[in-house]
Swiss-Prot record:
It comes from Chlorobium phaeobacteroides (strain DSM 266 / SMG 266 / 2430). The lineage of its organism: Bacteria, Pseudomonadati, Chlorobiota, Chlorobiia, Chlorobiales. This is Adenylate kinase. The keyword NAD does not apply. Its main location: cytoplasm. CDD domains: ADK.
């Protein structure tokens, strides 16, 4: 089964992606990982990509698509794969379609922006140990202090409210057209159209996981 899993920062996509891959025995593949692996292995596509990157240019969709084809030919993709961060644009989605790279499912884990902002902006971290807290969902015993050392907790820059809002806006700008594209395609009844679902991303990890499994098995 080939799956595209989409979700805003803080929607819990990473947790669910790991579970899907383990359950279906498929690899999670990203364009970044594919690029690094191809460059390191000095494949023809990797050599071409390295020339482009060394020149300070963006890797073209043509090269990205060649990497995807190369990766899908690997033995561990025989049962399918889960795409992480690809496609990012309608042009890339169209390229997949035109090259007859079939997809089984496109799924978005949907969480309202307000909920994501609360999730992320409430995080606090004890830097030296990596212990994490949340001001609402998992507060420390003493406000602002690590439970074990009593040292101050910090809010990472990525978790500051304005930063979260900017990241969400970028996600919506990039992904909304892509979601609409796959949603509309799924309704055409075309035999090569993937199924499409928007999964409610609130509740426990197990509840969200069950919604995903129910959708995949429907």
């Amino acid at each position: 089964m080939r799956i595209i899993l989409l979700g805003a920062p803080g929607a819990g996509k990473g947790t669910q992606a790991s579970y899907i891959c383990k359950t279906l025995n498929i690899p999670q593949i990203s364009t970044g990982d594919m690029l690094r692996a191809a460059v390191q292995a000095q494949t023809p596509v990797g050599i071409e990509a390295k020339k482009v990157m060394d020149a300070g240019k963006l890797v073209s969709d043509e090269i990205i698509l060649a990497l995807v084809k190369e990766r899908l030919a690997s033995q561990d993709c025989i049962n399918g794969c889960l795409f992480d961060g690809f496609p990012r644009t309608i042009a890339q989605a169209e390229s997949l379609k035109n090259d007859s790279i079939l997809l089984d499912y496109v799924m978005e884990i949907h969480v309202d922006d307000k909920e994501i902002i609360e999730r992320m902006s409430g995080r606090r971290v004890h830097l030296s140990s990596g212990r994490t807290y949340h001001v609402r969902f998992n507060p420390p015993k003493k406000e602002g202090l690590d439970d074990l050392t009593g040292e101050p907790l910090v809010q990472r820059e990525d978790d500051q409210e304005e930063t979260v809002k900017k990241r969400l806006q970028i996600y919506h700008d990039q992904t909304a057209p892509l979601l609409q594209y796959y949603h509309d395609w799924s309704l055409t009844g075309s035999p090569d159209a993937p199924r499409y679902s928007s999964i409610k991303g609130t509740g426990s990890v197990e509840e969200i996981r069950q919604r995903i499994l129910d959708a995949l098995n429907s």
